[in-house]
Amino acid sequence: MTAAVSTTDTPLNASPARGSIGISRKFKAYLALTKPRVIELLLVSTLPTMIFAQRGFPSIGLILATLVGGAFAAGSAGVFNCYIDRDIDKLMHRTEKRPLVTGEVTPREALVFAWILGAASIAILWFGANPLSAWLGLGAIVFYVVIYTMILKRRTAQNIVWGGAAGCFPVLIAWAAVTNTVEWPAIVLFMVIFLWTPPHYWPLSMRYGEDYRNAKVPMLGAIAGAKVVSVQVVLYAWAMVACSLLMVPVGGAGWVYTIAAVAAGAWFLYESHALYKRAQGGDVSNKGAMKVFHGSISYLTLLFIALAVDPFVGSAIVGS
């Protein structure tokens, strides 16, 4: 890391005082540290991947173990991230109300909570699914906390490209939970999310560019002009859509998935090119950038819903 992080228990904001909040508010503060919206997005890919790998519904016990274990792993990584980044979170309007900044949770409490969630996630995946999924869960935590948060985030504009790989682990965990191995279709889904991350996150960093500049975090959307960022968004969007279609020959996907991948991909490419056109004309706005950000979430959701439905309708277009 390029910036020192205090390890004391002194809150970054003196209000509210420790012990002055009720149980309900404390619970909400702990929940906020886990970044529940990020967890929701990660879980969108987990169950559909399990269904596709099984070519049907896995057992309820396996589904619950994988979803809960995966959520705990993501939550643990989120809390560690909030703990490490609490010095810069106070400098950004987007993150200034996080519990470690307001003092609702102390750094020591957050650190203990992160370790508990991490240990619980590995145990749940190990005994509820299999050791391979547990190792992948541990890998996801380490990758997000060490590779992204501690090494890349404050040092390079490519931080979200490589650090974002941690967000691709849920599909590997899901596939491994069902098959006890990692096969090529899982790798393709991993790469879809890997290529999806930049066009998802960079428009957000355009919207909050001033925040990142104040915190000296070199997100591409904050340090490069809209023209440069929009080109990168378009390139990654095309690569993502092309990669998604590999599930047809590699994963044996059928017509439901194929139609969704083509239609949703075409729509997202249109939105990406619209952002590019506005940026090249010097007419890009925060609203336009956020439209692509929200559109990327809709794209991924539609793609994985189709992945879940596909095994129940028709057969593979190309041999399985």
From Swiss-Prot:
Family assignment from sequence similarity: Belongs to the UbiA prenyltransferase family. Protoheme IX farnesyltransferase subfamily.
Entry annotated with the keyword Amino-acid biosynthesis: no
InterPro entries tied to this protein: Protohaem_IX_farnesylTrfase, UbiA_prenyltransferase, UbiA_prenylTrfase_CS, UbiA_sf
Native organism: Paenarthrobacter aurescens (strain TC1)
Keyword presence, Transmembrane: yes
GO cellular component, one term: plasma membrane
Membrane topology: Multi-pass membrane protein
EC number(s) from the headed UniProt entry: 2.5.1.141
Molecular-function GO terms, alphabetical: protoheme IX farnesyltransferase activity
PROSITE patterns to which the protein is assigned, alphabetical: UBIA
GO process terms (BP): heme O biosynthetic process
Subcellular location: Cell membrane
Pathway: Porphyrin-containing compound metabolism; heme O biosynthesis; heme O from protoheme: step 1/1
Keywords, ordered alphabetically: Cell membrane, Heme biosynthesis, Membrane, Transferase, Transmembrane, Transmembrane helix
Main location group: membrane
Note: Carbon 2 of the heme B porphyrin ring is defined according to the Fischer nomenclature.
Pfam families: UbiA
Protein name, UniProt field: Protoheme IX farnesyltransferase
Transmembrane segments: 38-58, 60-80, 109-129, 132-152, 159-179, 184-204, 222-242, 254-276, 299-319
Catalytic activity: heme b + (2E,6E)-farnesyl diphosphate + H2O = Fe(II)-heme o + diphosphate
Gene designation: ctaB
Role noted for this protein: Converts heme B (protoheme IX) to heme O by substitution of the vinyl group on carbon 2 of heme B porphyrin ring with a hydroxyethyl farnesyl side group.
